[in-house]
Amino acid sequence: MVEGLSEEKANELRFIELVYYFQQLAMVALGKLVNPGTNQAERHLPQAKAMIDTLRMLKAKSKGNVSDTEQKLIDQVILNLGLNYADEAAKPSAAPPT
C-alpha cells in the first residue's frame, strides 16, 4: 500500500499511473514523444493501436468500479490518443530513400 493512504486511495493512484503509463507508451509509438531507448521520435502505429486497445479494454473491464476522476481521465486519454492516432494514420509513410 502507498504510505499513509487508504487502500482505496492507493488503488486510485495506481489506476491513474497505469493509464498515464499506457498513454506515454502510445505517444512514443505515435512518434509524438521521443523514444528514450533510441533518443528519436519513431512511429509504430500497430504498437500505438495496441496501447489504445488496451486502454479501451481496461475501461470496459473497470466500468462501474472507478471514481468519477478515474472515469474522466481514461475517457479523455482514450479520446486524445484516438485523435492523435487518426492524425498519424492519415499521414503518408516516410518516402523510401532514393
Task: State the predicted function of each range.
Residues 61, 65-69:
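Well-ordered alpha/beta subsegment
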Residues 1-53, 57, 69-98:
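N-terminal intrinsically disordered, cationic/polar leader segments
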